[in-house]
């Protein structure tokens, strides 16, 4: 009980200190490592993108007494995905291995609601919840089919597709627009910031799966 009282008192003092802090707007530029995946496979494909993100965010103070901020900005993500379909059957007359090499470029508009816990005049911990809208600018894949006969290489077929265009039955391989949510936390020390976040989409990228996303971010505030 005594420990609980101490914790409650510490939180109260921290929040009270926040009320007297001067809350100003800010700008932030970030670079991020971004990993996207889906837990549901399709046609034995494991979707697993790795990429880099470039962000600009503007923080708007929502209150003079409470360090609550609304962040609005833009994000470019350049990513790639290498997937493999099927496995070689050395006993079969005909067998094949299909490799997919995909490249993506997306432009997103993230909106975050942040609360700045100011530890001292140099250090802040900033949890946030956000929403985003995103569009694919570029999405292409190269398909390499390696054909074998009794385990011996026979031939190779190479094709390239624009995933944003209709290929079969007027159905696109990937949707142009997407939207989702994210939750995370940043640690700011002086003008430098480091954070991690996780999120997933509201809209399925294709008809039967939704991408999840993790990002680790390093940024500079000014």
Question: Where do the protein language model's features map onto the residues?
Answer:
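Outer-membrane beta-barrel transmembrane domain signature
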Residues: 60-68, 78, 98-205, 220-222
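Outer-membrane beta-barrel translocator domains and adjoining extracellular loop/strand segments
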Residues: 39-45, 82-90, 139-148, 206-211
